């Protein structure tokens, strides 16, 4: 599509030059970018703590360093600051003042920001100490205009814990805020791993600390550091995406009903133990991403943000409007158009980057944020028509939420200019979401390729293997917006939840309980399952995106779904765990899938097909069920046929020379049949065009087998 370049606003000209189909919508794109830029201008020309103009990064840092409770090691004073515009008076209470509601009244300014200072105290030895002991309980008491008083956990609290049984019995199960100020603060030992945004691969291991143990219990940060990090390192992943870190009172919410945004979940341990986890990962060369939830918040009142100052519209849209709560999630929705909400959320990002040394974020629920209909109902039926996103009449975009996301990406770039990573969980395919801000995009590095797991599950549920359409598989895997990177995956935590099945269970079902032992001959069901598990993951990894994600346990074919303890399962932890004992057992076949996943990650690390231009697909043979493509100088060949193996099968390839196998899914150590003698397998090109490539090779490709080949000159020792 063409248009007069002079009519395109300068601030979005970059994205329009990349995608000419955006031309009719250039004005809309420009207006949306302008709103974010206007917000940024307001922020940068607000005054900082020294009374000067500020930067976006300084604005966010000043916020988390001033709001909430902060100890001054010089004066031993503790300062507390809170925004609560609906309150007329405020009091800091806690164990330190015997919960005296009138002992520590706060000062209110014209914006509804309350402040107070707790002076040091003198102990029995005559030594000055902080007026609030470390890890002691605190609350804030607000007096409203009608004289009534309400009690809340400080909004910026950095530690909140479950009450003991006696307290819960007397006062209820609401979480308790604690003043975290240890005598010795954790000191990071390792630098962040380097990451070149434009060239480096990203192989992500998605994990949940609490379920990262074979035992039916809540796992800890320390256990994850000691037991799971070495597995991730061994497999060859270079990033971890941690779920459920932000405090959530309801464990079964999977961490997506956040109550305390600045508090790392105390179920798993202390803040210092989380810091040690991140630090240890960095020492292994592994980036750590936080699954951040800024799309909504828990409806909890006494231990959450909901009705924090007695009103229903402080941090959120009013319940009197249609925008106050999510229609499906039973949660509150942020008002991204409010200055203090922007401050709170941006500061939250800076806090996790600075204090815990996270290297970036996976933003949950971006589709819900982007649209007033939240992607629910008819509004969520996206066809890809640009009018659905960019037409002022049809798009229903929440401009303020989009502006916030742009600012969030700006902030991450400022704080981590070299290696900060942002990933959007967006199913809608919003154009320009993953284009740079300076070109007119929203600034995310990647979006999740959410259509891919849906395709695989649909095929496994509804089609026989012999009916799989190679063209459909390829189209789904490569169908992404030009110059917008995606994270490919076959299954994430979403596919593991109760009511669904893991990929391995779709393939092998009940046979996983009876036929995975190597002490008896393998069955056709298990043979098929292991073979297709490898092919599906490798073709998704190599063709489906510019980064790759695996949910913990699925690398070895974890058999069971996830179900957190709740009233419907008798508060059982049986399914709220990862059975690493299965892959550790040398008598079970899970080890084969683990070893293949390790080989797949290692091969990508050595030859780097991720974060390179899309593959050239030369073959999609519907009868033979063969797919072939080239990416970054590698040749990938997949034979999905259930029964047919092919000898001297012609495969087109562009570069002439001698090719050798660098990854073979049929090796015995990966649960295959060793039908290819790799020591005798060198494939020389013939100088004749084939399938629109300049040359071809002839290969033996067994059924349900995948091969990756490289020019002999590129093959590394040990592949």
UniProtKB/Swiss-Prot annotation:
Quote the catalytic activity from the record.
Transfers a segment of a (1->4)-alpha-D-glucan chain to a primary hydroxy group in a similar glucan chain
Subcellular compartments: Cytoplasm
The feature of type site (Transition state stabilizer) is located at 494
Q: Which GO terms describe its cellular component?
A: cytoplasm
One Pfam family of this chain: Alpha-amylase_C
Q: Where does (1,4-alpha-D-glucosyl)n bind?
A: 99, 139
Report the main location listed first in the record.
cytoplasm
According to the record, the signal peptide region is: none
EC numbers listed for it are: 2.4.1.18
For this UniProt entry, the molecular function terms from Gene Ontology, in alphabetical order, are: 1,4-alpha-glucan branching enzyme activity; cation binding; hydrolase activity, hydrolyzing O-glycosyl compounds
UniProt pathway annotation: Glycan biosynthesis; glycogen biosynthesis
Active site annotation, chain numbering: 364 (nucleophile), 425 (proton donor)
Key words of the record: Cytoplasm, Glycogen biosynthesis, Glycosyltransferase, Transferase
What's this protein's function? Glycogen-branching enzyme participates in the glycogen biosynthetic process along with glycogenin and glycogen synthase. Generates alpha-1,6-glucosidic branches from alpha-1,4-linked glucose chains, to increase solubility of the glycogen polymer.
Q: Which protein family is it in? A: Belongs to the glycosyl hydrolase 13 family. GlgB subfamily.
Q: What is this protein called in UniProt? A: 1,4-alpha-glucan-branching enzyme
> What is the native source organism of this protein?
Kluyveromyces lactis (strain ATCC 8585 / CBS 2359 / DSM 70799 / NBRC 1267 / NRRL Y-1140 / WM37)
Q: Which gene encodes it?
A: GLC3
């Amino acid at each position: 599509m063409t248009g007069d370049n002079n009519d395109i606003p300068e601030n979005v000209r970059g994205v329009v030059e990349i995608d000419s189909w955006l031309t009719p919508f250039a004005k809309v794109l420009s207006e949306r970018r302008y709103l974010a830029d206007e917000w940024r201008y307001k922020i940068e020309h607000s005054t900082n703590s020294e009374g000067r103009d500020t930067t976006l990064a300084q604005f966010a840092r000043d916020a988390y360093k001033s709001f909430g409770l902060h100890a001054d090691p010089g004066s031993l004073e503790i300062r507390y600051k809170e925004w609560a515009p609906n309150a007329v008076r405020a009091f800091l209470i806690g164990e330190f003042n015997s919960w005296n509601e009138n002992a520590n009244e706060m000062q209110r300014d014209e914006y509804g920001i309350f402040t107070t200072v707790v002076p040091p105290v003198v102990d029995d030895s005559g030594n000055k100490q902080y007026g609030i002991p470390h890890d002691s309980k605190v609350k804030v008491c607000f007096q409203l205009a009608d004289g009534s008083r309400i009690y809340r956990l400080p909004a910026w609290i950095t530690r909140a814990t479950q009450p003991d049984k006696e307290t819960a019995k007397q006062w209820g199960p609401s979480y308790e805020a604690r003043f975290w100020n240890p005598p010795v603060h954790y000191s990071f030992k390792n630098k962040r791993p380097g990451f070149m945004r434009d060239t480096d691969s990203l192989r992500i291991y998605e994990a949940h600390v609490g379920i990262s143990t074979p035992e039916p219990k809540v796992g800890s940060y320390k256990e994850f550091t000691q037991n799971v990090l070495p597995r991730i390192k061994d497999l060859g992943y270079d990033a971890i995406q941690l779920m459920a870190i932000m405090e959530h009172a309801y464990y079964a919410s999977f961490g997506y009903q956040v109550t305390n945004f600045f508090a790392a979940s105390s179920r798993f341990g202390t803040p210092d133990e989380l810091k040690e986890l991140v630090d240890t990962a960095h020492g292994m060369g592994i980036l750590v991403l936080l699954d951040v939830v800024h799309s909504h918040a828990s409806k909890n009142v006494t231990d959450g943000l909901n009705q924090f100052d007695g009103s229903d519209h402080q941090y959120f849209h009013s319940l009197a409007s249609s925008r106050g709560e999510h229609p499906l999630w039973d949660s509150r929705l942020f008002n991204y158009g409010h200055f203090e909400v922007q401050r709170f959320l941006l500061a939250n990002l800076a806090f996790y980057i600075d204090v815990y040394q996270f290297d970036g974020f996976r933003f949950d629920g971006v589709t819900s944020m982007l649209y007033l209909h939240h992607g629910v109902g008819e509004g969520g039926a996206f066809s890809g028509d640009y009018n659905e996103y960019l037409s002022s009449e049809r798009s229903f975009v929440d401009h303020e939420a989009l502006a916030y996301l742009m600012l969030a990406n700006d902030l991450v770039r400022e704080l981590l200019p070299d290696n900060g990573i942002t990933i959007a969980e967006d199913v809608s395919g919003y154009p320009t979401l993953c284009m740079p801000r300076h070109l007119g995009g929203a600034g995310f590095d990647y979006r999740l390729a959410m259509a891919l797991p849906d395709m695989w599950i649909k095929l496994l549920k509804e089609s026989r293997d012999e009916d799989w359409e190679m063209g459909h598989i390829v189209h789904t895997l490569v169908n992404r917006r030009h110059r917008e990177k995606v994270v490919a995956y076959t299954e994430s935590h979403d596919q593991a939840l109760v009511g669904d099945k893991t990929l391995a269970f779709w393939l092998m079902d009940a046979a996983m309980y009876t036929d995975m032992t190597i002490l008896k001959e393998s069955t056709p069901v298990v043979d098929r399952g292991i073979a297709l598990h490898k092919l599906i993951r490798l073709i998704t990894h190599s063709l489906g995106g510019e980064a790759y994600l695996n949910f913990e346990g699925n690398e070895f074919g974890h058999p069971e779904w996830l179900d957190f303890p709740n009233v419907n399962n008798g508060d059982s932890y049986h399914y709220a765990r990862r059975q690493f004992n299965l892959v550790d057992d040398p008598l079970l076949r899970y080890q084969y899938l683990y070893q293949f996943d390790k080989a797949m990650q290692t091969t990508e690390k050595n030859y780097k097909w991720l974060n390179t231009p899309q593959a050239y697909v030369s073959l999609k043979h519907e009868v033979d069920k063969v797919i072939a493509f080239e990416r970054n100088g590698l040749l990938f060949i997949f034979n999905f046929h259930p029964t047919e193996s092919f000898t001297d099968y012609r495969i087109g390839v562009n570069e002439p020379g001698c090719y050798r196998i660098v990854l073979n899914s049929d090796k015995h150590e990966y649960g295959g049949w060793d039908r290819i003698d790799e020591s005798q397998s060198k494939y020389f090109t013939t100088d004749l065009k084939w399938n629109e490539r300049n040359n071809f090779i002839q290969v033996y490709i067994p059924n349900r087998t995948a091969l990756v080949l490289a020019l002999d000159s590129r093959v590394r020792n040990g592949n």
